[in-house]
C-alpha cells in the first residue's frame, strides 16, 4: 500500500460515526422541560391580558376595543340641594376635539364618593339639544323619560358601593368626538343636599385612536 492509499484509509476511519447511543435523559432534564412549558403557557396568558399602546385598559377593568383608546375627564358637582339637579356638558381637551370625526364607542361614568358622602344620587348621561340651558326643569324631564340608563348610588358603610359605574353604548349611533359637546352628565340629589366635598365623577370616553395618543392613558 502506498502512502496515498494509507492516508485515504486513515481519513475513512476518522469519518466513521461513533458507535454507541446517548445516555437517557435525566429526571432533572424532564422536570426542566415541564417547567419551561408551564412558564411559556403562563407568559402567553399574561400577555393576552396585558394592555398595550394599541389596546389599553379601559378603566382598569376592561380593555378598549382594538383601535380605540379613551380620554378621561373629572367632574366635581357643586352643592346640589335636596331634590334638585345638576348638569354639565362633556368638554374634551382641545388636543382631542381637533380630531372631531373620530368615532366614539362608549361612555363610562364612575362615581367616586369622598369620605363625607352620606347621600343618595342618581347619575346619567344624555344627548342634550344645543338650545337646552340644563335647567332644573329640563334635567328633571330627562330623568323621568327613561331614555337612558340611570345609576343610583347610595351611601355604603364600607365607603364604596359595589356598583359604582355604568356604560353608555354609542356604537349604534355612530357618534363622534365632535358630538360629545351635545352630551351632558346629569345628577339628581334625592334624599339630602349634596355638598361640594362629597362626590367626584370620572367620565371615560372611549374613542378611535388619535395621533396624539402616544402613551397609555392614566
UniProtKB/Swiss-Prot annotation:
InterPro entries per UniProt: Cucumovirus_coat, Cucumovirus_coat_Asu_sf
N-acetylmethionine sites (modified residues): 1
Cellular component, GO annotation: ribonucleoprotein complex; T=3 icosahedral viral capsid; viral nucleocapsid
Biased amino acid composition, Basic residues: 11-21
Domain of life per record: Viruses
Region annotated Disordered, chain positions: 1-28
Alphabetized UniProt keyword annotations: Acetylation, Capsid protein, Ribonucleoprotein, RNA-binding, T=3 icosahedral capsid protein, Viral nucleoprotein, Virion
Chief location of this protein within or outside the cell: virion
Cell location: Virion
Molecular function in Gene Ontology: RNA binding; structural molecule activity
Membership in a protein family: Belongs to the cucumovirus capsid protein family.
Function: Capsid protein. Probably binds RNA and plays a role in packaging.
Entry remark concerning the domains of this protein: The N-terminal arginine-rich stretch does not seem to be the major RNA-binding region that allows formation of an infectious ribonucleoprotein complex.
Name of the protein: Capsid protein
Taxonomic source organism: Cucumber mosaic virus (strain Banana) (CMV)
Amino acid at each position: 500500500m502506498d502512502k496515498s492509499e494509507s492516508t485515504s484509509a486513515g481519513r475513512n476511519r476518522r469519518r466513521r460515526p461513533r458507535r454507541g447511543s446517548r445516555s437517557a435523559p435525566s429526571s432533572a432534564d424532564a422536570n426542566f422541560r415541564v417547567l419551561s412549558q408551564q412558564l411559556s403557557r403562563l407568559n402567553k396568558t399574561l400577555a393576552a391580558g396585558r394592555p398595550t399602546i394599541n389596546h389599553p385598559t379601559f378603566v382598569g377593568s376592561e380593555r378598549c376595543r382594538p383601535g380605540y383608546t379613551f380620554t378621561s375627564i373629572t367632574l366635581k358637582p357643586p352643592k346640589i340641594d335636596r331634590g334638585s339637579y345638576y348638569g354639565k356638558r362633556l368638554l374634551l381637551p382641545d388636543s382631542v376635539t381637533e380630531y372631531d370625526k373620530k368615532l366614539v364607542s362608549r361612555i363610562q361614568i364612575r362615581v367616586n364618593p369622598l369620605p363625607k358622602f352620606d347621600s343618595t344620587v342618581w347619575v346619567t348621561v344624555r344627548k342634550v339639544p344645543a338650545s337646552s340651558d340644563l335647567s332644573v326643569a329640563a334635567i328633571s324631564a330627562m330623568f323621568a323619560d327613561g331614555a337612558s340608563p340611570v345609576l343610583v348610588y347610595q351611601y355604603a358603610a364600607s365607603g364604596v358601593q359595589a356598583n359604582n359605574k355604568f356604560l353608555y353604548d354609542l356604537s349604534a349611533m355612530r357618534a363622534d368626538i365632535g358630538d360629545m359637546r351635545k352630551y351632558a352628565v346629569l345628577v339628581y340629589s334625592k334624599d339630602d343636599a349634596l355638598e361640594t366635598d362629597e362626590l367626584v365623577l370620572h367620565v371615560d370616553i372611549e374613542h378611535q385612536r388619535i395621533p396624539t395618543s402616544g402613551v397609555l392613558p392614566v
